[in-house]
């Protein structure tokens, strides 16, 4: 303001002016510019055919994603008295105190699963594939997921072949094509928002 217009004013004055012009303060979100448009378009066309087949009950389409949910509180906005800070109690358990959650969306069934593990890597990923096959022993399974390194690991790919599970990777930098992302948003808004969990068990039970 001072550099461009040669005037000085406090932040509250600027905020009030912006509110009058119907602007609001929002948290920024990244717009990923590294995605390949052609690969995304090809994937969307392929996905359209896959989902059309799923409506005829073949194959069982599974969207699978992972998230690391911390025991400490996720801080967001909330109501507080004017002139008072909005305090949230925390035991500061540290960033290493977390649970890795595998989120599963069964498209044909309209159902979701949340399967917690101490970490997300090759071994629990194989366990998740085995669990999916146990739930659907006689159906063709198609798993859609991102390009996480452990998704591409040889042990995971071999397990998928052994279990007769087809893998369909999403194009890079395309979280908008993963519906499980909405599950993570719900989890952080309804479970971890402004709430510090005493233990990993407490976090899992509350989720």
Residue map of PLM features:
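C-terminal anion-handling pockets and recognition modules
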Residues: 13, 57-61, 181-207
